[in-house]
Amino acid sequence: MKKIQTITSAANPVIRFTHALVHTRGRAAKEGLFAVEGVRLAEMAVSSDWNIHHVLVTEQGMNSTRARTLFTQLCAADVPIYSVSDSIFRTISETDAPQGILIVMERKIRDDDTLHEHTYTFGAVAPLYIALDRIQDPGNVSTILRTADAVGISGVIL
């Protein structure tokens, strides 16, 4: 079980890497990673079968019961967790009102055949995908996913 490490400098390599991942176009794809923000998306990330690279959290981000449950699970899974100040977190966050938790996750690498699993025959309905890029409000992702599911979208590409 790993402890939560405190980072106090914006020049720390983890902070610089995460900032570049979130704010430099193409960096996340190049690294095979992506970031999600907010308690709800963090809960979804922890309950998924996707690998978590590392977590940034503020003191405020650890205050809720839901967040403490998340951190217990993350610590048990030996995920690196870094505590940062609100000011450092705001430089990385893309939301107007950050909740104080950001998870960097590994992308699942899929080859072209994966998307073609939904091949169709003449007369059948073609598969339909939604691609999401640089979502401003992480709460919008869950809304988009629920809507996509309701209308029968074949998949969502993050």
Regions found by a protein language model. Give the residues of each.
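Glycine/small-residue-rich loop that forms an oxyanion/phosphate-binding "nest" at active or ligand-binding sites
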Residues: 71-101
